Amino acid sequence: MKRTIVALLCVIWLALSTGVGVAAERPVDLDLSALSGTVVYSQVYNMVMQPDQYLGQTVRVRGNFSYFQDPVTMKEYFAVIIADAAACCAQGIEFVWRGEHRYPDDYPPLETEMTVTGEFGTYEENGFTYLQLSEADVEWGK
């Protein structure tokens, strides 16, 4: 019995000390999650207008979860929506959640508060340039 308890405690200690089940903290170049709504909105607007200045940077942002599926292509898009301080205007950044996830099974309800950390990039689709945080780590309710 004692041997079983000791073995179990060793396994738990080993799991905790090696980080099993814990997302690794990654260095962040631009952390917008702690800034006021107006400052974040302004910064995201700047990212929209001058995306080349941010390419390849790791960005963290807090906002609300949004989802869209193109009715023609059936392609799914996931975004974090950031409102300004007055909540009259909003900007969104698409994200690609690292790993395998299915909507709606692995996602919370729309507009759930979230924090997204990912590599900033852009892509072209149908003649438009879109912002995207790729290889994103997602925390719900934070």
Where are these regions (language model features)?
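Positively charged n-region of N-terminal signal peptides that target proteins for export
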Residues: 1-4
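OB-fold and OB-like single-stranded nucleic-acid-recognition modules
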Residues: 17-142
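Intrinsically disordered, low-complexity regions enriched in Ser/Pro/Gly/Gln/His and often acidic
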Residues: 6-7, 133
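Bacterial N-terminal signal peptides
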Residues: 8-17
